[in-house]
UniProtKB/Swiss-Prot annotation:
Keywords: Acetylation, Membrane, Mitochondrion, Mitochondrion inner membrane, Transit peptide, Transmembrane, Transmembrane helix. Assembly factor that mediates the formation of some mitochondrial respiratory supercomplexes (respirasomes), thereby promoting oxidative phosphorylation and energy metabolism. Acts as a molecular adapter that associates with both mitochondrial respiratory complexes III (CIII) and IV (CIV), promoting their association. Mediates the formation of various mitochondrial respiratory supercomplexes, such as MCIII(2)IV(2), composed of two CIII and two CIV, and the CS-respirasome (MCI(1)III(2)IV(2)), composed of one CI, two CIII and two CIV. The gene is Cox7a2l. It holds the Pfam family COX7a. Disruption phenotype: Knockout homozygous mice manifest decreased mitochondrial respiratory activities and impaired formation of mitochondrial supercomplexes in muscles. Mice display muscle weakness and exhibit heat production failure in the cold. This is Cytochrome c oxidase subunit 7A2-like, mitochondrial. Belongs to the cytochrome c oxidase VIIa family.
Length: 113
């Protein structure tokens, strides 16, 4: 005797061997090919203009600029914006580290009852 879970009665019910070994919802796939559906062609507009957004290749210039031996660290070569970004990153890193250490200290202290 084979049993299969009945989703209607929410209990085990008797079943044939072929039904019991086939998981619910999974049946053999049919071998018939689905009908071919062709998409309707879209109408292209005739006023298409091409723009070149890539611009000039700046890589060789930037390589020369960053490889220049002027004693300035690489992360500060571009001046004030790089300095501000560096200082902001360091301040946020230090602030986050201090915050985590304070949170760990507070979590390690027992509460008074």
């Amino acid at each position: 005797m084979y049993y299969k879970f009945s989703s209607f009665t929410q209990k085990l019910a008797g079943a044939w061997a072929s039904e019991a070994y086939t998981p619910q919802g999974l049946k053999p796939v049919s071998t018939e090919a689905p009908p071919i559906i062709f998409a309707t062609p879209t109408k292209l507009t005739s006023s298409v203009t091409a723009y070149d957004y890539s611009g000039k290749n700046k890589v060789p210039e930037l390589q020369k600029f960053f490889q220049k031996a002027d004693g300035v660290p690489i992360h500060l070569k571009r001046g004030l914006p790089d300095q501000m970004l560096y200082r902001t990153t360091m301040a946020l890193t230090l602030g986050g580290t201090i915050y985590c250490l304070i949170a760990l200290y507070m979590a390690s202290q027992p509460r008074n009852k």
